[in-house]
Amino acid sequence: MENAHTKTVEEVLAYFGVNESTGLSLEQVKKLKEKWGSNELPAEEGKTLLELVIEQFEDLLVRILLLAACISFVLAWFEEGEETITAFVEPFVILLILVANAIVGVWQERNAENAIEALKEYEPEMGKVYRQDRKSVQRIKARDIVPGDIVEVAVGDKVPADIRITSIKSTTLRVDQSILTGESVSVIKHTDPVPDPRAVNQDKKNMLFSGTNIAAGKAMGVVIATGVNTEIGKIRDEMVATEQERTPLQQKLDEFGEQLSKVISLICIAVWIINIGHFNDPVHGGSWIRGAIYYFKIAVALAVAAIPEGLPAVITTCLALGTRRMAKKNAIVRSLPSVETLGCTSVICSDKTGTLTTNQMSVCRMFILDKVEGDSCSLNEFTVTGSTYAPMGEVHKDDKLIKCSQYDGLVELATICALCNDSSLDYNEAKGVYEKVGEATETALTCLVEKMNVFDTDLKGLSRIERANACNSVIKQLMKKEFTLEFSRDRKSMSVYCTPNKPSRTSMSKMFVKGAPEGVIDRCTHVRVGNAKIPLSSGIKQKIMSVIREWGTGRDTLRCLALATHDNPPRKEEMNLEDSSNFINYETNLTFVGCVGMLDPPRIEVASSIKLCKQAGIRVIMITGDNKGTAVAICRRIGIFVEDEDVSTKAFTGREFDELSLAAQRDACHHARCFARVEPSHKSKIVEFLQSFDEITAMTGDGVNDAPALKKAEIGIAMGSGTAVAKTASEMVLADDNFSTIVAAVEEGRAIYNNMKQFIRYLISSNVGEVVCIFLTAALGFPEALIPVQLLWVNLVTDGLPATALGFNPPDLDIMNKPPRNPKEPLISGWLFFRYLAIGCYVGAATVGAAAWWFIAADGGPRVTFYQLSHFLQCKEDNPDFSGVDCVVFESPYPMTMALSVLVTIEMCNALNSLSENQSLMRMPPWENIWLVGAICLSMSLHFLILYVEPLPIIFQITPLNVTQWLMVLKISLPVILLDETLKYVARNYLEPGKDSVQPATKPCSLSACTEGVSWPFVFITLPLVIWLYSTDTNFSDMFW
């Protein structure tokens, strides 16, 4: 039924053709069941495990690797001789990598799907209905309830469907609907129509929503929606419709993968075509097909070389390390890729209650009457310190500390606060904090009594548990609470009837009243001044109301409560407590005692965090279900708005936002910094508009209602105290519910991205080198310098360790002084691409050169000519060009070992180059990142392991090297540092002359300026070693003449 909240009870009952006392007939139930189906949320049809697994292989690079593995497997099957076993190692290793990557991917996807399932925990098992087949109420399964059913709910019940209340069977009906609307206090319901068809859920006071809890009272109502048509069902539909966006990094890697796969395909085809002329060479037994297969194997090796297999593992490790660092700062990251997305967050949409504020109501101001002269009066105003539920704080008057026991008015005010109250404080030993038991407003009054300590109770030596309610206990010992007149909407107040514990002629029964100031003061006839009772004149009333109005608006927007007493109420026997409409008659002739002003105070550290966000170019938007006045006041307090800023185009209520045209809504989202009185659908809309401006949005939320927006935003942030649905729909959970934690996480995200850029570039330059190596050997006609199983070892293990260590590079000091990076900026710019191409070409040439050195110039080598080496496939005993050459030498493991050792050593040097994008190694020595030094040592140790420990050399087709050969490896490898230092110098001084450059690039640099910041220990250690290395004899020059 649409807009049931606007209709009268009679209209709703007539619509369903049902009688409130008898309920639906079985015939009606059957028809309605057929029309509307079961009252349950359908189980989410998630992807099957097989679908999820197949999805992981949709990536182009993964497909190329899979193809390479299949081809390698087929070729290994037909391999003959000794190599049969080693031939199977390569496809097996590739498949192992792919399986590991797929497992990680499937696990992450599965996590994302749990959010929709978690909604089911809010479905009640049973419901109580009236139907015509039975005279009394009957319990049935909640899933069998249909629209039109008459349902009964009582305290503790979970509401089984969306219900229009028809009658309330208790004084009041309070409902905790925080999971749906985010309201922190329970809501009082009624049966009157709410005439506004566009009312938000918070304002539908005559409705009960499925999944919410009855906090107090008992009621009956008619079901108006079941299953997916309920408010919680609509949230489920919205979540199902929300597709997870890929993170900026995932998009970058997808683009990179596509480009790389095109390049790989081209290079593989090129290598194959270049060598068509060699297909018939004698070494292939003159068989064209064998020759084609041989070069096909080389093309497969190329594909394996070009793909950075280690990249997914290194990225996952780096992000996992990042999540551990974030967890220490109370940010628990649920989805690894979102760690990096945090780094480019440009807008943070934050909830007010509990995130920007403490969600711990506290009294900060109060007043009593000081003097009354005729029609005018003066007030004693006090301020109270302390912004949490901890019972510690001070009371000040005119900025001076005072003792509350010296003011009779304050003693009476504290008495009313303690007795007209059903809440208390509790010390949670596990968390080490004081918590509320009961309503937030009443707990604030309990806490105020503790801070006032009006009877000067000795609090020293009390344990924290005893301290929680010590002062309240003293007051409660003086008087006994007989009964409570519950709060009702018509009088907007509640009261307690108390009798003295020690009866005497002077002490008598009293009624203590608290409530909304305008309602209570209208029923007051006197005011309390000290111990005296003075008639309330219109002048005094005006003065009191003007102060209350002032407190309720402006910067503070305090929630004010008036406190009053009835000095001689009727005897309890004379009072009719059955009918709550009589209560107002007993709360008349009151004496006004004082007023307290309370608020949910901002967290102390939030203002500095918002300042940091402004420096970092991040816009903070407050989104709250609270009213606009309070929201704007808090915004001014914490720095989202400056003190006297005009907010007419920067703060909107949900209603105001809906009334704007689409273009105006879009414009509002571009400038607004505060949205008040919003519903969940508004949050999703705001996220959509922000995404249309290419903003990367972080959205906080804690209720079920926030789940769709959390899922839609790039970074959904749930509160640690929030619902399971919100947590499972989010990417990150704030363990301490604190806004400042988000800012710390953004800073960490930025640092992680910078480090990630470094190691992605490092790994890619390594792959470029491998591709160049294989391309050169094929183009020059040399024997294979590297085989796929060696390439996999380098890509995964020896490169993987330093790449992971680069994730520990220290963050830049000015990381939060820069605007958020553009998520569309390329991972590798044009200049950087040239740099890595240059480095890669050197790596490839050096690797091939090392293999050629063994053939042409090494002492223990065959010392063949360049021609013989480049035409080795024509080597036969009867070929005059190869007289005196044993053709078996071309299958020796030495050249491969030289090539692999040079590749590994160059990569270690390259890791040192990656310590900083543009900073010289002489200024940023290796020990700046001690993890990197350790990783390089470990990688070299693993390389020695495969060289010198049996049977590993057989698997990798390599052999141990002697000292001369190792010296040659170092000679060929070290120049890569010089090459990158030159490229860094060009970048620093000519392409990106920024803060680092001491002198303008045009002027020659003076010696003192050039050597400033140089790490002399590094220079003194490395220079003699380099000079010694290049002075040793390794027949290097014999290669060239």
Curated annotation (Swiss-Prot):
Annotated residues for binding of ATP = 353, 442, 489, 514, 559, 624-626, 677, 683, 705
Q: Which domain of life is it from?
A: Eukaryota
UniProt topological domain (Lumenal) ranges: 70-89, 274-295, 777-786, 851-896, 949-963
Explain what switches its activity on or off, per the activity regulation comment: Reversibly inhibited by phospholamban (PLN) at low calcium concentrations. Inhibited by sarcolipin (SLN) and myoregulin (MRLN). Enhanced by DWORF; DWORF increases activity by displacing sarcolipin (SLN), phospholamban (PLN) and myoregulin (MRLN).
- Keyword set, alphabetical order: ATP-binding, Calcium, Calcium transport, Disulfide bond, Endoplasmic reticulum, Ion transport, Magnesium, Membrane, Metal-binding, Nucleotide-binding, Phosphoprotein, Sarcoplasmic reticulum, Translocase, Transmembrane, Transmembrane helix, Transport
Stated EC number for the protein is 7.2.2.10
Binding residues for Ca(2+) 2, per the UniProt record? 767, 770, 798-799, 907
Q: Which transformation does this protein catalyse, written as a reaction?
A: Ca(2+)(in) + ATP + H2O = Ca(2+)(out) + ADP + phosphate + H(+)
Q: Which GO terms describe its cellular component?
A: membrane; sarcoplasmic reticulum membrane
**Stored SUPFAM superfamilies:** Calcium ATPase, transduction domain A (SSF81653), Calcium ATPase, transmembrane domain M (SSF81665), HAD-like (SSF56784), Metal cation-transporting ATPase, ATP-binding domain N (SSF81660)
- Tissue range of expression? Only isoform 2 is detected in heart, while both isoforms are expressed in brain, with isoform 2 being predominant.
List the residue ranges forming a coiled coil, or say none: none
User: Topological domain, Cytoplasmic: which ranges?
Assistant: 1-48, 111-253, 314-756, 808-827, 917-929, 985-1041
Name one process (GO BP) from the record.
response to xenobiotic stimulus
- Co-factor requirement: Mg(2+)
UniProt region (Interaction with PLN), positions on chain: 787-807, 931-942
Q: How does it sit in the membrane?
A: Multi-pass membrane protein
Q: Which family does it belong to?
A: Belongs to the cation transport ATPase (P-type) (TC 3.A.3) family. Type IIA subfamily.
Question: What's noted about domains in the record?
Answer: Ca(2+) and ATP binding cause major rearrangements of the cytoplasmic and transmembrane domains. According to the E1-E2 model, Ca(2+) binding to the cytosolic domain of the pump in the high-affinity E1 conformation is followed by the ATP-dependent phosphorylation of the active site Asp, giving rise to E1P. A conformational change of the phosphoenzyme gives rise to the low-affinity E2P state that exposes the Ca(2+) ions to the lumenal side and promotes Ca(2+) release. Dephosphorylation of the active site Asp mediates the subsequent return to the E1 conformation.
Note the subunit structure.
Answer: Interacts with sarcolipin (SLN). Interacts with phospholamban (PLN). Interacts with myoregulin (MRLN). Interacts with DWORF. Interacts with TMX2.
Q: Its biological function?
A: This magnesium-dependent enzyme catalyzes the hydrolysis of ATP coupled with the translocation of calcium from the cytosol to the sarcoplasmic reticulum lumen. Isoform SERCA2A is involved in the regulation of the contraction/relaxation cycle. May act as a regulator of TNFSF11-mediated Ca(2+) signaling during osteoclastogenesis.
Q: What is this protein called?
A: Sarcoplasmic/endoplasmic reticulum calcium ATPase 2
